[in-house]
UniProtKB/Swiss-Prot annotation:
Species, as recorded: Bacillus mycoides (strain KBAB4) (Bacillus weihenstephanensis)
Stated name of the protein: UPF0637 protein BcerKBAB4_3786
Endpoints of the signal sequence: none
Gene3D superfamilies referenced in this protein's UniProt entry, alphabetically: Protein of unknown function DUF1054
InterPro entries: UPF0637 (IPR009403), UPF0637_domain_sf (IPR053707)
Annotated HAMAP family: UPF0637
Family in the record: Belongs to the UPF0637 family.
Top-rank lineage group of the source organism: Bacteria
Length: 208
């Protein structure tokens, strides 16, 4: 069985210089874990939603010069891809791992989803755990901690999703390398489930 939890070696992959060299390290160290997570949590999400979920490990095929600074496995209801749909992600940067649900700029249903989120704005503010974080750009590691946001701040991020063509919105958790050093494989898998649970109602709002 492939160990799915991330180690210091996995995070250090993002210090490897050169596109080919870093991609080789990603494929050797991280992709087997993402594949294992993909199989397990595609099944989990399918059971939770009564829909068929498929997993997609990032290939970084468009990169010709610069090596990737993060990598991930994404989960959607389309066999061919995920970027055009609301989706879940598990992945890592050199500084942290992440577990997200969200919509990125390629998704054509951002406007409808933003309106649904705004209708349930107070519920989102109340029901998203305080230690969760919000990202408005999946290509950058910066986030906003949920407990520091006023309802108006959350409203502005959601409205931006509807009005700005390249806008994105993702929500979930970060896990530091230090946290992983004290975390068993079973604890990591349980952490993923406990993170996805409060995000499933957001997925349901996307599919009303």
């Amino acid at each position: 069985m492939t160990l799915q939890t991330f180690t210091s070696t996995d995070f250090e992959v993002f210090t490897v210089d050169g596109l080919e060299e870093r991609m080789s390290a990603i494929k050797t160290n991280i992709h087997p874990k993402l594949e294992a997570l993909g199989e397990q949590f595609a099944e989990y999400l399918s059971q939770q939603t009564d829909e068929s979920f498929f997993y997609h490990v990032a290939k970084h095929a468009r990169r010709k010069v610069n090596p990737p600074n993060d990598t991930w496995v994404a989960f959607s209801t389309n066999k061919r891809g995920y970027k055009m749909l609301p989706h879940f992600q598990i992945g890592l940067w050199g500084t942290h791992a992440f577990i997200y649900f969200g919509l990125i700029y390629e998704c054509p249903q951002k406007v409808e989803t933003a309106h649904a989120f705004l209708e349930h704005l107070n519920d989102l503010k109340t029901n998203i755990p305080n230690d969760f974080v919000w990202s408005i750009d999946h290509t950058k590691p910066g986030v906003k901690l949920h407990k520091t946001l006023e309802t108006e701040d959350l409203q502005k991020m959601i409205e931006r999703l509807a009005t700005v063509k390249k806008a994105e919105l993702l929500v979930g958790i970060h896990i530091s390398p230090e946290e992983f050093s004290a975390m068993t494989n079973e604890q990591f898998l349980a952490k993923i489930e406990s993170t996805m649970q409060p995000l499933l109602p957001l997925y349901a709002l996307c599919n009303r």
